[in-house]
Amino acid sequence: MKPIDYDKVQYKDYARGRAVNAEQLRVWVDAFAAVLPEGRPLDGLDLGSGTGRFTPALADAFGPVTGVEPSVRMREVALGGPPHPGVRYVAGAAEAIPLASGSVDYALMFLSWHHVPDKAAAVRELGRVLRPGGRLLLRGNFRDHHPRPWWLEHFPRGYEADAAIFQPLHEVVETFTSRGWRVHDFRTVTEPSGGTRAAMLGRLRLGTLSLFGQLSASEAEVGLARLEAAVAADPDSPSPTFAEPLLTLQVG
């Protein structure tokens, strides 16, 4: 995939374009709880925490969380939100996590794995900071298990360009299991609708999805025009839902 520099443009609208509502957060937290150890509190790592979409909810549900984010601007947005006593945001990357060895019980990577350039280094670092038996919750798309959001078909090369961003599931699994990890769980999660079709169109216009970094300007323009015409027929109907994959891996 073409690298995306979140410090240039995307940070400005990311929180709005990728917002999750309270009901969606609840569904994801329930899914995370189902694959995490039962004990509380748990020390958590939100790796690639961005603008802090999930970090406070993780702290509320499970215990103190450190959000690690390489983008200065995205981190500034997160720090500008309401303070949370169980949350801190720090600079860092998957290949260089600024935490002590064996300091966290779990890590969440929510649609951030595909941005990691050196995946082998990231696996080593995750294995270092997680305690024995610690778990990685990897909400990633996979080329061979790729969701089909209703709006994607309106973009030229939409599905092809979006799926190409991600590795196949077996390749991701092999990256971890070849280094001593094991698969703990694989499931799909269907989050509730985020609003109307018209609201989804408005968020897509902000261009905060990785897809828009892979399309040409003309492809994005054509796709948005097609989508606008389709939405105009029924703008107030709920945005359709779709299943999203969640892979849980365990270290040691």
PLM region spans:
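Class I SAM-dependent methyltransferase SAM/SAH-binding core
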Residues: 45-47, 51-96
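Short catalytic micro-motifs in class I SAM-dependent methyltransferases
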Residues: 111-115
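Short alpha-helix
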Residues: 165-179
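Conserved Class I S-adenosyl-L-methionine
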Residues: 21, 51, 182-252
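A short glycine-rich, Lys/Arg-flanked "PGG" loop and its adjoining helix->strand segment in the class I
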Residues: 120-132
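Conserved class I S-adenosyl-L-methionine
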Residues: 1-42, 53-57, 74-77, 81, 135-164
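A conserved beta-strand element that flanks and buttresses the S-adenosyl-L-methionine
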Residues: 108
